[in-house]
UniProtKB/Swiss-Prot annotation:
GO terms for molecular function: flavin adenine dinucleotide binding; FMN binding; sulfite reductase (NADPH) activity. It catalyses: hydrogen sulfide + 3 NADP(+) + 3 H2O = sulfite + 3 NADPH + 4 H(+). Component of the sulfite reductase complex that catalyzes the 6-electron reduction of sulfite to sulfide. This is one of several activities required for the biosynthesis of L-cysteine from sulfate. The flavoprotein component catalyzes the electron flow from NADPH -> FAD -> FMN to the hemoprotein component. NADP(+) binds at residues 521-522, 527-531, 563. This is Sulfite reductase [NADPH] flavoprotein alpha-component. The lineage of its organism: Bacteria, Pseudomonadati, Pseudomonadota, Gammaproteobacteria, Enterobacterales. It comes from the Bacteria. FMN binds at residues 71-76, 118-121, 154-163. Keywords: Amino-acid biosynthesis, Cysteine biosynthesis, Electron transport, FAD, Flavoprotein, FMN, NADP, Oxidoreductase, Transport.
Length: 601
C-alpha cells in the first residue's frame, strides 16, 4: 500500500509541487506570503470579466482612452458608462473599468485616462478607489509625463470637503507630471447639464491633441474591463413595487426605531444579488410641506414650471425638492432674503454657521424666522430631491419575488421637537401594505459573496449594517454552501436591539453560522463595541485569514468602520509580527484581492 503523504488531506498537490511550494515559502517575507495567498485565492475565485474589443487596421494607431469609475452610490458609475458609450459613438477606442479592478501600477503605460470619482465620509475616496488612492499618493507612484488625463468629481456642496477625492487625484496627477486635458470639474448633486458640457469639451480636447499621443498606443488590458449591464429600471426610470410588510423590529424601549420592509416585485422584471442596494424615491411629508408654505405666505395652489411641466408648488415640494436637510448655502441665501440680524450674525462666523447647519432643520429655521417669499424664490433656495440607497437584506434565490430592506429611522430631538429624516420618515411612517413605492436596483459588485462556496467569510456589522449579511446567509443557506460563516454584530441592548434574532439563532442551530460574537454597548457599565469582540478573537480570526477567509464590514463609515479597521490591523500586526506600515500593506493586499470588502455609509 502506498504511504500517504501527511499533507495530502490538506494540499491536493504532487510531491514535486509541494516541495516547490515549501521552497518558495522559505524565501518569502511575511508581506510576500500575504500577497501570494491573496493572489492564488483570487485566481481560484475569479471569473471571466472581459469585454471583447475589435479594431480595424485604421484604428490600431489610435490611443486607448481608459475611463475609471470610482463610485460610492452609483452616480460615478452611471456617468462613466455614458462617457464610454459617447466615446464609442464618436469612434474612440475606450475601455471602462471599476477603480477596484484597475491595475494601477500600470498607470505609467496609459496615454489617456479619465477619472470620474465621488467623495464619501470626511473627504475620502469611495471604497473601491482606496487602494488606487493610497498608491498614487505614495512615494512609489510613477512619473506620469506621458499621461493626458481629466477628472470629473461628484459631491455635495453642503459638505465642507466638497469633491475632495477628485481634487486630491487631480493635484497628485499634476505633481507626477500628468498633462490635464481639461480643468477638473467639481459637480454638485445637480450635475446633468455640467456633465453634458464637460463630456463634449473633453472629446474636443482629446481630438485637438491627437497628434501628440497617437504615435504611441497604450495596450488595452481586457482583463477586468467592466461589462456594461442593461437594467430596465434605473434612477431616472424607477419601478413601482408594492409594500407587503412594514414592521418595527426594535423593542418598545429601544432608543432606535428600525423597520423591516418587504416589497412585492412579482410583476416586475427585477434581478438583484446579495450585496446590492435598493434605491428609493421618497415623498416629503404633506404636513411638512403645508407648514413651510404657510410660514412663507405661499398659497399651496400656486403653480410653477419644472422641466417644462407646470405643477403646483405643493406637488413640487412634496416630490421634487429636499426639505429635511439644511445646508450652509440655503442658510446664507435665506439670511440675505430675511435681513434677519440673528441669521446675518450666524453666516458671518464659520464655526457658528457649521453648528447651526447641523442643529437646525430647514423647517425650524423657517419657523423661527418666517418671511414672505415667492414660489420661485423658495425653489431657488432648495436642492433637488435625490433617492436614498438601502442595503438589500434578502436573497432573491430564497424569497423569489420580493425585496427586503432594513431601515433605521433618522430622528433629531431639538428644543423638545422630534424631526424625522426625509426618506426614513417616509418609509417608516407613511407607507402601509399595498402602497406603491418607486424603486431601482443599485448594483454593488464590490460587496459580493465568494464565488467558491467553500470560502469562509467573516461578517462585521453594527446597527442596520447587519442588513446585507441577512441576505448573505439566506443565499448561503439556499446554496448549501460549505464555507464557514462568522458574524460579529453590535448594537446598544440585547433585549431591544437584536435585529433578526430568531433568524440568526435558526442558522446557528442548523450549523450555517459557525461563530457569532455580539457586542451590546449599553448592557453593562463598561461599554463593549464590535471592535472589542474582534480583538478578543485575535488568534482565531488570524487563523481564518490564513485559511483564505473573506472579510466584510458594513456600518457607519466615520466611527465603526474605522475602529474595526484599527482592530484588524492590530490582529495582523500581532499574529504576523509586522509593524504598522507592513500591517497596512497586508490589509491593502487583502482589499486588492477582494478579501477585505466594506459597504460603509
Amino acid at each position: 500500500m502506498k504511504n500517504q503523504n501527511k499533507f495530502d488531506p490538506v494540499f491536493p498537490l504532487s510531491s514535486e509541487q509541494l516541495n516547490n511550494l515549501k521552497e518558495l515559502e522559505r524565501t518569502c517575507t511575511n508581506i510576500q506570503s500575504a500577497w501570494l495567498s491573496g493572489y492564488f485565492w483570487k485566481i481560484a475565485n475569479q471569473t471571466s470579466n472581459i469585454t471583447s474589443f475589435q479594431t480595424n487596421e485604421s484604428e490600431k494607431n489610435d490611443p486607448v482612452i481608459t475611463i475609471i469609475s470610482a463610485s460610492q452610490t452609483g452616480n460615478a458609475k452611471l456617468l462613466s458608462k455614458r462617457l464610454y458609450e459617447y466615446f464609442n459613438k464618436n469612434n474612440k477606442i475606450s475601455r471602462l473599468i471599476d477603480a477596484m479592478d484597475y491595475k494601477f501600477k500600470k498607470i505609467k503605460d496609459e496615454k489617456i485616462l479619465i477619472l470620474i470619482i465621488s467623495t464619501q465620509g470626511e473627504g475620502e475616496p469611495p471604497e473601491e478607489a482606496l487602494s488606487f488612492y493610497k498608491f498614487i499618493m505614495s512615494k512609489n507612484a510613477p512619473n506620469l509625463n506621458n499621461l493626458y488625463y481629466s477628472v470629473f468629481g461628484l459631491g455635495d456642496t453642503s459638505y465642507n470637503l466638497f469633491c475632495q477625492a477628485g481634487k486630491d487625484f487631480d493635484k497628485r496627477f499634476k505633481e507626477l507630471g500628468g498633462n490635464s486635458l481639461l480643468d477638473r470639474f467639481d459637480a454638485d448633486i445637480e450635475y446633468e447639464d455640467n456633465y453634458n458640457k464637460w463630456s463634449q469639451d473633453l472629446l474636443q480636447s482629446i481630438n485637438s491633441k491627437e497628434k501628440i499621443y497617437k504615435s504611441s498606443v497604450s495596450y488595452i488590458d481586457q482583463e477586468n474591463t467592466l461589462i456594461l449591464s442593461k437594467n430596465h429600471y434605473t434612477k431616472k426610470n424607477p419601478a413601482e413595487g408594492i409594500i407587503l410588510t412594514n414592521q418595527k423590529i426594535t423593542g418598545r424601549n429601544s432608543k432606535k426605531d428600525v423597520h423591516h420592509i418587504e416589497i412585492d416585485i412579482s410583476n416586475l422584471n427585477i434581478k438583484y444579488s446579495p450585496g446590492d442596494a435598493l434605491g428609493v424615491w421618497y415623498k416629503n411629508d404633506s404636513n411638512l410641506v403645508k407648514n413651510i408654505l404657510e410660514l412663507l405666505s405661499i398659497n399651496i395652489s400656486e403653480t410653477i414650471t419644472i422641466k417644462n411641466d407646470v405643477i403646483t408648488i405643493f406637488d413640487a415640494l412634496q416630490n421634487h425638492f429636499e426639505l429635511t436637510n439644511n445646508t450652509k448655502n440655503i442658510i446664507k441665501s435665506y439670511a440675505n432674503f430675511s435681513k434677519n440680524k440673528f441669521l446675518k450674525d450666524i453666516i458671518s462666523n464659520d464655526s457658528d454657521l457649521e453648528n447651526y447647519t447641523i442643529n437646525t432643520p430647514l423647517i425650524k429655521m423657517i419657523h423661527d424666522h418666517p418671511l414672505k417669499l415667492s414660489s420661485q424664490q423658495l425653489i431657488g433656495l432648495l436642492r433637488p430631491l435625490t433617492p436614498r440607497l438601502y442595503s438589500i437584506s434578502s436573497s432573491q434565490e430564497e424569497i423569489d419575488n420580493e425585496i427586503h430592506i432594513t431601515v433605521g429611522v433618522v430622528k433629531k430631538l431639538i428644543s423638545g421637537h422630534v424631526y424625522l429624516g426625509g426618506a426614513s420618515g417616509y418609509l417608516s411612517q407613511s407607507l402601509k401594505s399595498d402602497d406603491i413605492i418607486k424603486i431601482f436596483i443599485q448594483t454593488n459588485d464590490n460587496f459580493r459573496l465568494p464565488i467558491n462556496k467553500n470560502t469562509p467569510i467573516i461578517m462585521i456589522s453594527s446597527g442596520t449594517g447587519i442588513a446585507p449579511f441577512r441576505a448573505f446567509m439566506q443565499q448561503r443557506d439556499n446554496d448549501n454552501a460549505d464555507g464557514k460563516n462568522w458574524l460579529f454584530f453590535g448594537n446598544p441592548n440585547f433585549t431591544e436591539d437584536f435585529l433578526y434574532q430568531v433568524e440568526w439563532q435558526k442558522y446557528i442551530k442548523k450549523g450555517l453560522i459557525t461563530n457569532m460574537n455580539l457586542a451590546w454597548s449599553q448592557d453593562q457599565k463598561n461599554k463593549i463595541y464590535v471592535q472589542d469582540r474582534i480583538r478578543e478573537n485575535s488568534q482565531e480570526i488570524w487563523s481564518w485569514i490564513e485559511e483564505g477567509a473573506q472579510i466584510y464590514v458594513c456600518g457607519n463609515a466615520s466611527k465603526m468602520a474605522k475602529d474595526v479597521e484599527k482592530a484588524l490591523l492590530d490582529i495582523i500586526s500581532h499574529n504576523a509580527h509586522l509593524n504598522l506600515e507592513e500591517s497596512q500593506e497586508f490589509l491593502n493586499n487583502l482589499r486588492l484581492n477582494k478579501r477585505y470588502k466594506r459597504d460603509v455609509y
